[in-house]
Each structure stands twice: as C-alpha cells, then as structure tokens.
Amino acid sequence: MPMTDYRTLGRSGLVVSPFCLGTMTFGTTRWGSGEPESQAIFNAYIEAGGNFIDTADVYSSGRSEEMLGKFIEDGALRDSIVLATKSGFADGHGPHAGGNGSKHIRTALEASLRRLRTDYIDLHWIHVWDSVTPAEELLETMAALVRAGKIRYWGISNTPAWYISKLATLAVSRGLPGPIALQYFYSLANRDIEDEFVPMAAEFGMSIVPWSPLAFGLLTGKYNRESVESAAPRAAGLPREAAQQGERRADGDKRLDGANPFGDSLFTERNWKILDTLKAVSEETGYSQAKIALSWVTHQTGVASTLMGVSRVAQIIDNVAALDIVLSADHQAALNAISAPDQKMLYSLFTPVLRQHAVFGGSTVRRLHP
C-alpha cells in the first residue's frame, strides 16, 4: 500500500493519504524539532506522497502553525494538500481562551488562518469537549464557518460518543454539514474506542484518524519491564513543560523516561504482555515492532488515515514502509487476542454468539447495509 493509495475521509469528497503528518512537535525543543529539521520532515513527507497535514492552535504556542504556513507558502503547496488544525484547548487566560463556544472558535480560527498564511482550512477539528457548549451551538457555528468558506469540513476529537452522536443526528435532521472524522488515541496498547466510537463512526459515515499509534513510543521496542523498573528518573516534568524550558533532550532520552503523564497508564502488566507478543511477531517476520504496530492500526475497521508524529526524517521513511506489511492471519490473531480490551458487562451482551442465541433464537442474522 503506497502513500498514494488515497482514500476519502468519511462520507465526503475530501481525499487523504494513509498517513497524516502530525506536527505537534514542530517548534518544540525537548521532544521535537526546530525549523530546519521540521522543514526537512515536511519535505520528506510530501516527497513520499503524503497530502494530509495536521496541527493545532496550541502546538508550540502557535509556532507549529507558523512554520507550516511558511513551508506551504514557500512550496506553493496550498492547493495540493489537506490542511487540518484545531481549536478547543486554552491558548491564554480567561473563560473564552478555550472551549467550543462560537466566540472562541471564531477567534481561534482567525488566528490560525493568519499563522498558516491561508484564507481557509480544509479540516477543522474540535480538539476537546468543553462539557458546557450545547451541541446545537457547536453545529451551527461549524456550519456557518463552512458557508463562509473559512473551513471546508470539520471533525471532532477527545469528546464523548453521546455528544458526537447528537451532533451527527442534528446535522442530518437540519441538513447541515456534520463531522466527517474522529481523531482519537488508538493503538495495540489502547483499543477503548472500539466499543462506542468505531461503530458510531460507521453509522454516521465518519472516518477514524488515530493519534499516537505507537502509544507515545511504548510500542517501538525501546521499553521493557527490566529497563523501566531499574531506570533512574530523568527528564523531570511533563513532556510539554520540559519542551518549553528550552532544553534539548539528551541522546537516548526517550518520551516515557522519568516523570511523565503517560507511564502510570502505559507501564502495566497488560501492556508488557502485548510487548512480548509484539516482539515475538517481530522476530518471526523480521519487521520492527514499530512497523508491525503501525501496520496493525492502519488496517483496523474505519481507519482512513493514521497520524504519525516524528522528530527525524528517517522516521518518515520507516513509517511509510509499514504500509507494505501484510501480517499473516496467525500473527494478526495473536496481536488481536493479547491486546483485546477487557469487555465491559454491557458490551458482553452484544457479542455475536450471545446475540445469535439469546436474541435471534439460534438464527444467524447479518446486517447488510450500514
């Protein structure tokens, strides 16, 4: 599968490549890259056939957008790429510094347009649910921005499934443009979205765009029980905080080393078992653990494009190579089994076997159309 195996994003005519370039690290110091490195990464992605670029207003305090605006303008690439940015997280102080209200979205979007040196955004993501803005207001705001030509499409991230379902239902009933894609944490280490978000996306014609498919580096093969348990704390502070302190990470300093907001949830017995299986599949196939983990994500139901965040050009090349991997049925089954999330009581009622016998009286019933 080459990078030029383009696909539509959701039920729309927006065409994207199978990997999306995430630029959260553009402009950061500790965990990312400065302008020359970011330019090289951007160029390598475009040369590989990629056309989908993702950023946000808060990434590197706006520096990520500024860099992208320059790269795109200098390369005369605006018409050939799909440019996505986000709003929702606070970019300052005060109640209107963030959120999903019309006031903040419009203000944030205008600032993003200036930094990106463009007059429209192809895909505007709602970055996070604010828990207070009515779905009706958010939908009307996004529809108005589409009508005004400020954005072409919109999607949503880090938001409860019930709220997204309400947005999508209102959009259909009112004849307004609804969200076409969902951006969520999805990897072998975390498959929580499979219970609600994946089937909801299929029902409403939305694509899944996974972020952190390597689980913040956990699935790259850099970590194991012994090294984590024996390691002395390093890189104190959250990655975002450390990145703003102007420090360049030391050689060998990894994303999950030392104090960080992810280790407690990722360094678990379940994930060590996933890594053991991933390592075994890697040894049997000759592919790196990272490539196998990426291949697994890209082949999951509903996934149209997968975000890759990189800090070196070589990582672009390695990630793209994962598109050519086709895992055997046995290897796929092994990874699926070891990474299967614990089934909640409610969802155990929806398993095919129970549905066949307890609901349809022993008959096999298939749904042919979404």
Predicted regions and their residues:
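N-terminal binding-site loop/beta-alpha segment at the start of enzyme catalytic domains
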Residues: 1-81, 147
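Terminal-tail/helix-coil boundary detector
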Residues: 2-3, 203, 226-284, 299-304, ...
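Conserved, mostly hydrophobic/aromatic
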Residues: 9, 21, 38, 53, ...
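Short acidic capping loops at alpha-helix termini that bridge into adjacent secondary structure
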Residues: 17-18, 76-81, 85, 119-123, ...
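Active-site beta-loop-alpha junctions enriched in small/polar residues
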Residues: 24, 56-58, 86-90, 126-129, ...
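Glycine/proline-rich, positively charged
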Residues: 29-30, 47, 92-196, 203-207
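Generic structural signal for well-ordered alpha-helices
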Residues: 42, 65, 69, 109-113, ...
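Structural motif corresponding to the early beta-alpha repeats
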Residues: 75-100
